[in-house]
């Protein structure tokens, strides 16, 4: 597959040919189910005539059906473009196909999509990760040059790691959330999934920047990262030793090999433990579900989306939500409503926010002394379909990614090895807030060392 860097140098006629070839390949590879159109048999959604970029099904694109992988949004047509889409169009890139996802981005396997499963292109018996599983599978499967996803607790980094591509979550507030269907407003962040680190940096440069339409967008100085990539730069890297040691044997072996390569190249490696990670999962799911219960209250069958049969207004609300939401979404709405309810708000939500502040302080303390943090993306490689049916087990699988969202830091997953089942293993790098340049420099160095 042509890289994004190469595609941006093509003439308009060459881009036209590329789009035709890519569309033919998407139709041929229908079994992968990376795109909603592959699962439904509908024509491929397109906007613009530029370099084709696959778009997760929770990002608004004017005139497209955008459903967030949910039955409740059947029939909804987006009336406007997300800011990220406007930025693509302004740089001669185009929205090209809706990628499958876990319903409302709530999941780690892309098994909860209303449209059906997406397969992992490396091994079809295994999940592609989630919630941006369609975006990662499309890029890794050679049916997308690059893609946009969203990351609330690892939903860009983890599927990219499971499928063997690069997943980049920018600092919270760096990329506008205007036009992103909200799951958890204080955690969600749009970002790129790409074939390599440089392509991820290029796509990030295009979509990043302050946006007055988004109240959570930070007005922080921004300059191009891709133009200044330096994979030769020597960095101080802190390895989270207990996270590496607690990973599966194959993952641990691959991570230690990557650490040795970084050390031999000249990066300074130090080791530390994050001992208080036992609070991460609880804090994340309390905060995320609390925000989700509020954000998803707008889906009532009245204003947009699917409307159920009903005799009165109350019945309309109840029937539309009961029939429209999947089991995982219902579970998280109920949990979020519970933790915000009278008598439990202080016991759960306020404590979770205090834990969040503690988690952020832990990262800041480490990053005061190191340029980057190195740790796993996931404790294991991609599991088989059905193995994550236990909600608690599924929630615990995010243990190495969710704390980064709680802290609002930039992070990236970089492929480093394959296991005996041809499944990918990735390392995760984390940087200080707003220091995407150092993050990309470190990721490029790691990528170069792995590729030899």
Curated annotation (Swiss-Prot):
Keyword terms of this UniProt record: ATP-binding, Ligase, Nucleotide-binding, Protein biosynthesis
A GO BP entry: translation
PROSITE patterns in alphabetical order: AMIDASES
Any one annotated GO CC term: glutamyl-tRNA(Gln) amidotransferase complex
Active site location: 56, 131, 155
Domain of life: Bacteria
GO molecular function list: ATP binding; glutaminyl-tRNA synthase (glutamine-hydrolyzing) activity
Keyword Protein biosynthesis: yes
Pfam family, one: Amidase
Reactions catalysed, as given in the entry: L-glutamyl-tRNA(Gln) + L-glutamine + ATP + H2O = L-glutaminyl-tRNA(Gln) + L-glutamate + ADP + phosphate + H(+)
Keyword Protein biosynthesis among UniProt keywords: yes
Documented EC number(s): 6.3.5.7
InterPro entries on file: Amidase (IPR000120), Amidase_CS (IPR020556), Amidase_dom (IPR023631), AS_sf (IPR036928), GatA (IPR004412)
Family the entry assigns: Belongs to the amidase family. GatA subfamily.
Complexes and interactors: Heterotrimer of A, B and C subunits.
Functional summary from the UniProt entry: Allows the formation of correctly charged Gln-tRNA(Gln) through the transamidation of misacylated Glu-tRNA(Gln) in organisms which lack glutaminyl-tRNA synthetase. The reaction takes place in the presence of glutamine and ATP through an activated gamma-phospho-Glu-tRNA(Gln).
The protein's name in its UniProt record: Glutamyl-tRNA(Gln) amidotransferase subunit A
Gene assigned in the entry: gatA
């Amino acid at each position: 597959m042509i890289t994004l860097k190469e595609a941006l140098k093509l003439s308009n006629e060459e881009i036209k040919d590329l789009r035709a070839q890519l569309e033919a390949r998407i139709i041929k590879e229908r079994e992968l189910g990376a795109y909603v159109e592959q699962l439904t048999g509908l024509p491929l959604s397109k906007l613009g005539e530029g370099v084709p970029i696959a778009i997760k099904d929770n990002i608004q694109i004017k005139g497209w059906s955008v459903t967030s992988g949910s039955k409740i949004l059947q029939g909804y047509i987006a009336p406007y473009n997300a800011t990220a889409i406007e930025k693509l169009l302004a740089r001669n890139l185009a929205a090209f196909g809706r990628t499958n996802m876990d319903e409302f981005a709530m999941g780690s396997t892309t098994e909860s999509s209303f449209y059906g499963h997406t397969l992992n292109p490396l091994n079809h018996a295994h999940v592609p990760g989630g919630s941006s599983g369609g975006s990662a599978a499309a890029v890794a499967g050679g049916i997308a040059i690059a893609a946009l996803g969203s990351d609330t607790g690892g939903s860009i980094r983890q599927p990219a790691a499971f499928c063997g591509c690069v997943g980049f979550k920018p600092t919270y507030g760096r990329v506008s959330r205007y036009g992103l269907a909200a799951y958890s407003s204080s955690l969600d962040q749009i970002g790129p999934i790409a074939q390599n680190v440089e392509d991820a940096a290029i796509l990030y440069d295009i979509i990043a920047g302050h946006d007055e339409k988004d109240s959570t967008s930070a007005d922080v100085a921004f300059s191009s990262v891709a133009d200044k990539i330096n994979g030769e730069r020597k960095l101080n890297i802190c390895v989270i030793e207990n996270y590496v040691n607690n990973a599966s044997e194959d993952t641990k072996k691959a991570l230690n090999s990557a650490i040795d390569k970084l050390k031999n190249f000249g990066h300074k490696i130090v080791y530390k433990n994050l001992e208080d990670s036992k609070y991460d999962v609880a804090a994340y799911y309390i905060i995320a579900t609390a925000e989700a219960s509020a954000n998803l209250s707008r889906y009532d069958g009245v204003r947009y989306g699917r409307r159920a049969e009903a005799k009165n207004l109350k019945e309309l609300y109840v029937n539309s939500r009961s029939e429209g939401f999947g089991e995982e979404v219902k579970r998280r709405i109920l949990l979020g409503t519970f933790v915000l309810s009278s008598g439990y708000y202080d016991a759960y939500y306020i404590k979770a926010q205090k834990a969040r502040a503690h988690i952020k302080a832990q990262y800041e303390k480490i990053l005061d002394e190191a340029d980057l943090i190195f740790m796993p993306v996931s404790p294991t490689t991609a599991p088989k379909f059905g193995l994550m049916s236990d909600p608690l087990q599924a929630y615990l699988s995010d243990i190495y990614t969710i704390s980064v969202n709680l802290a609002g830091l930039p992070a990236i997953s970089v492929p480093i090895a394959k296991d005996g089942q041809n499944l990918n293993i990735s390392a995760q790098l984390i940087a200080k807030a707003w220091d995407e340049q150092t993050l990309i420099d470190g990721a490029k160095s790691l990528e170069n060392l792995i590729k030899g």
